């Protein structure tokens, strides 16, 4: 018999109220540092390595950031993306080590150290200077390392790779030796990017383009023999006056080095009468040149094809020698005159075309960017300083046709932000055509998966157009070009490959200083008198470009396997991706990576680049101090990284809102798992209530999509699916419905344990979905989940305890989706009733659902449990024909809501058949004092 409890007023102790120590507020900025300490005190990374042992490997090779300065938001994006991939690959069942690295040699560090201790060989010896550079780089690495760790990035931070580690320096030299062995190295004088402030050559990736105002001049080159020139043209009229070829340039300082005039063999050229003079111009550019120089009328006197004009001679404007017309395909009709001033010292195209004609260099400019004595009128002047003098000289000799100013894009040094020049210097190169390197690299590009796919076309174009790679630098702090060359012939020592390995062994023991300390006699014996050590250092892009060999092939964690992925910002197509591709192809005939993923740059809320002058810089440190690392990570994951990544306070607040929804879902799950022991209380799938089985099936389907999105690096899709699951499928439907069953049924009833079983499965899955992105929060949740488990979520694979609904299940997903449609329509009507003050809350309502046959059959399956789905005190189904209200927004449904006339149960708050306001409803009487109510569906 059921005993009446109508006199009892407080029923709180009879309810299964949610309870958890998991805090409602994340307080991430305060809590995360403590979690990090726990991770490192307990050697988390090594535990992940141990748990992954023997699994299929996935190697993401870290592109080394430069060891200088604090990390910026772009660094944070890069490291977080890598960390998400490493953690998700671990969860997908891979062994995925992460060895962070740093680029430690090169000019920026030299400049910082110069500011501290002076230039090498002035106040301090070169050896001491290198030691100071090493010390400075080490300090920078430690500072950046702390910031990267604070982001929640897991890796072997105690054993990173540094390009200045002795073993790495030695292996860089060995990679150089392999390139030499394969015949890719040569020495030559070629025009290279030259920074006057650095007094050194620059790599392509160290060049930035900024707008600059330059002189724009048209210059006459008088014909050396007018009749010889005229004879090559088909003339319709002789014309009158002096005959000149006209060139256009924005670099007057290069004119002293002019050695030729390039024309296109396929273009038509004309002799044109401009006033009292005759000019040779490309036929299609005559009109634009006339406008530029202020000539209103002109007359074409004759024409000729470019190929017919080869080797015609013209006088240099101010030196006593002639320059020839030479043929070059680089001459276009994009601007100018169709005749290109050619100075092989100062332009790549100029150098290539002049070489075909055996035209040598002028050699007028020294390392300091000043003209030498051979430049005569301009001796001692800096190149840009000389611009004015050249213009004066041109005007003096009558060669200056027109002078204007032009604003145009011009190459600048990435470090000094000052304009650079092209300058021919003796350097060491890896030849793009040597041994077919260019074609082999292009072939390898096609074997790589590029993410996004436009990356392939981008790097292909760069490889097609790039010049030979100048790998030598005239610096102090860098890996040496470890070669001995003959003092007279400049030929390499016949034992070069053997000597390179000997040097590598020395460097392995003592670092790069061993090269400069080395007495050539120690390796060469009597040969030392005839050979000298090369004083140059390797381009730092060679350092980082060779890490596929110096690190990936030599770290035991990688087991000699090649990298599966390189991941960097989109500027690295011409940087690290390029240098790595060229070197790996030169040494191993294959690309060093299977996949290359690039992310865009960060911009502010208005789409502007981060800039100190604008004052719009968002630093990761500020974000973490204000919001916490997980919010920064969630922003990165939820942003489509294939384009520009917009970050602002407003956007981060939106990320924080999304975070709260996820956290609240997790907290609800944990609070309702109070008292649940999976070993004791777990309900088998076939015994679970229908709605609970559906919820697990929902998680099963979500997990399949989330795993696929992680596997395809679509992290914004992961976040969207996570949000949909938490907010829509769970939050606005399932979790809302189960509250009554969870709180009011008997604590150990099937109805409640079935629900808790579903919640437990969902929580086990959810925490793993979150872990790669919301690492701190996932770790926190992990500590509150019931049941035996490993110490950290990061050693786990995705949860395998979810299940799909059986195909024979009549209440399948399609069924519940239709129920959701009905419930949404009921909610719309209830909301209107609330607005009309008919009811307060939904439990005050009784609803009648007038439904067509399809919906009637659907809803009647739930029987008396329909009211638990609508969360009303009563819900009954009648035929649509009996409706006394109009159909609503869903065809086939008409909903009527009235205020219940019954008493409110003081325990479950449903309005029912209790005799008065203090009496329990019959359902609660059964749950408190009887055997408990039964549920089958909801």
From Swiss-Prot:
Record's subcellular location: Cytoplasm
Superkingdom classification of source: Bacteria
CDD domains: Anticodon_Ia_Ile_BEm (cd07960), IleRS_core (cd00818)
Segments carrying motif 'HIGH' region: 65-75
PANTHER family cross-referenced by the UniProt entry: ISOLEUCINE--TRNA LIGASE, MITOCHONDRIAL, SOLEUCYL-TRNA SYNTHETASE
Domain notes for this protein: IleRS has two distinct active sites: one for aminoacylation and one for editing. The misactivated valine is translocated from the active site to the editing site, which sterically excludes the correctly activated isoleucine. The single editing site contains two valyl binding pockets, one specific for each substrate (Val-AMP or Val-tRNA(Ile)).
Protein name per UniProt: Isoleucine--tRNA ligase
């Amino acid at each position: 018999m059921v005993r009446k409890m109508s006199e009892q007023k407080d029923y709180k102790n009879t309810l299964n109220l949610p309870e958890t120590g998991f805090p409602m507020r994340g307080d991430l900025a305060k809590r995360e540092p403590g979690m990090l300490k726990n991770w490192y005190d307990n050697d988390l990374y090594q535990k992940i390595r141990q748990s992954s042992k023997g699994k299929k490997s996935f190697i993401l090779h870290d592109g080394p950031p430069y060891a200088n300065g604090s990390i910026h938001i772009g660094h944070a994006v890069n490291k977080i993306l890598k960390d998400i991939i490493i953690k998700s690959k671990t969860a997908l069942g891979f062994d995925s080590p992460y060895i962070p690295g740093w680029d430690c040699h090169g000019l920026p560090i030299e400049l910082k150290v110069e500011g501290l201790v002076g230039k090498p060989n002035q106040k301090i010896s070169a050896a001491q200077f290198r030691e100071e550079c090493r010390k400075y780089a080490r300090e920078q690495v430690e500072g950046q390392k702390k910031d990267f760790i604070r982001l929640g990035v897991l890796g072997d931070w105690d054993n990173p790779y540094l390009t200045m580690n002795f073993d790495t320096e030695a292996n860089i030299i060995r990679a150089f030796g392999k390139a030499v062995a394969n015949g890719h190295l040569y020495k030559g004088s070629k025009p290279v990017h030259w920074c006057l402030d650095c007094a050194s050559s620059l790599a392509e990736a160290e060049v930035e383009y900024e707008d600059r105002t330059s002189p724009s001049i048209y210059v006459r080159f008088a014909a050396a023999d007018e009749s010889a020139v005229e004879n090559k043209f088909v003339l319709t009229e002789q014309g009158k006056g002096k005959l000149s070829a006209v060139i256009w340039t924005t670099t007057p300082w290069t004119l002293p080095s002019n050695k030729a005039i390039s024309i296109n063999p396929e273009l038509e050229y004309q002799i044109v009468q401009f006033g009292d003079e005759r000019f040779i111009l490309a036929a299609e550019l005559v009109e634009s040149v006339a406008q530029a120089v202020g000539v209103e009328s002109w007359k074409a006197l004759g024409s000729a094809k470019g190929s017919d004009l080869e080797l015609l001679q013209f006088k240099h404007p101010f030196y006593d020698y002639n320059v020839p017309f030479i043929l070059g395909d680089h001459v276009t009709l994009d601007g100018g005159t169709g005749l290109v001033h050619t100075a092989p010292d100062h332009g790549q195209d100029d150098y290539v075309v002049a070489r075909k004609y055996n035209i040598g260099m002028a050699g007028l400019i020294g390392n300091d960017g000043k003209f030498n004595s051979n430049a005569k009128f301009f001796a001692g002047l800096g190149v840009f300083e000389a611009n004015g003098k050249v213009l004066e000289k041109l005007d003096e000799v009558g060669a200056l046709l027109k002078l204007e100013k032009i604003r145009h894009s011009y190459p600048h040094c990435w470090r000094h932000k000052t304009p650079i020049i092209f300058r021919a210097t003796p350097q060491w190169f890896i030849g793009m055509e040597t041994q077919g390197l260019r074609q082999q690299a292009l072939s390898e590009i096609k074997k790589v998966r590029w993410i996004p796919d436009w990356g392939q076309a981008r790097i292909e174009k760069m490889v097609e157009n790039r010049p030979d790679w100048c790998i030598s630098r005239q610096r102090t702090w860098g890996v040496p070009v470890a070669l001995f060359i003959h003092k007279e012939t400049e030929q390499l020592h016949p034992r070069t490959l053997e000597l390179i390995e000997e040097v590598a062994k020395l460097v392995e023991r003592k670092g790069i200083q061993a090269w400069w300390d080395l007495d050539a006699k120690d390796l060469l014996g009597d040969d030392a008198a005839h050979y000298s050590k090369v004083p140059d250092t390797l381009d730092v892009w060679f350092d980082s470009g060779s890490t596929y060999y110096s690190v990936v092939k030599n770290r035991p964690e990688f087991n000699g396997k090649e990298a599966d992925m390189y991941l960097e910002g989109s500027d690295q197509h011409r940087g690290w991706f390029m240098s790595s591709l060229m070197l790996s192809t030169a040494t191993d005939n294959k690309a060093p990576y299977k996949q290359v993923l690039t992310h865009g740059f960060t911009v502010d809320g208005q789409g502007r680049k981060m800039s100190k002058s604008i004052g719009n810089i968002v630093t990761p440190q500020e974000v973490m101090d204000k919001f916490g690392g997980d919010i920064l990570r969630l922003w990165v994951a939820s942003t489509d990284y294939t384009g520009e990544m917009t970050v602002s306070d407003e956007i981060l607040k939106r990320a924080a809102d999304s975070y709260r929804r996820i956290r609240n879902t997790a907290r609800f799950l944990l609070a309702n798992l109070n008292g649940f022991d999976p070993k004791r209380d777990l309900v088998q799938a076939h015994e679970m209530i229908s709605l609970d089985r559906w919820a697990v099936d929902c998680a099963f389907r979500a997990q399949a999509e989330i795993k696929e999105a992680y596997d395809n690096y679509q992290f914004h899709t992961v976040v969207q699916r996570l949000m949909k699951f938490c907010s829509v499928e769970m939050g606005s439907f399932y979790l809302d419905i189960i509250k009554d069953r969870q709180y009011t049924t008997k604590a150990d009833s099937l109805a409640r344990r079935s629900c808790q079983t579903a919640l437990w499965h969902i929580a086990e899955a959810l925490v793993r979905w979150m872990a790669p992105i919301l690492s701190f929060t996932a770790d926190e949740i992990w500590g509150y989940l019931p049941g035996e488990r490993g110490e950290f979520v990061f050693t786990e694979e995705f949860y395998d305890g979810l299940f799909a609904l059986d195909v024979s299940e009549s209440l399948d997903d399609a069924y519940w989706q239709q129920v959701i449609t009905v419930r949404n329509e009921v909610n719309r009507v209830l909301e209107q009733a609330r607005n009309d003050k008919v009811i307060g809350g939904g439990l005050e309502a009784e609803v009648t659902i007038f439904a067509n046959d399809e919906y009637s059959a659907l809803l009647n399956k739930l029987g008396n449990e329909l009211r638990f789905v609508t969360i009303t005190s009563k819900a009954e189904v009648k035929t649509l024909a009996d409706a006394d209200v109009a159909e609503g927004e869903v065809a086939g449904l008409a909903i009527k809501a009235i205020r219940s006339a019954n008493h409110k149960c003081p325990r479950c708050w449903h309005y029912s058949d209790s005799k008065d306001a203090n009496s329990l409803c019959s359902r609660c009487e059964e749950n408190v004092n009887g055997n408990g109510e039964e549920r089958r569906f909801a």
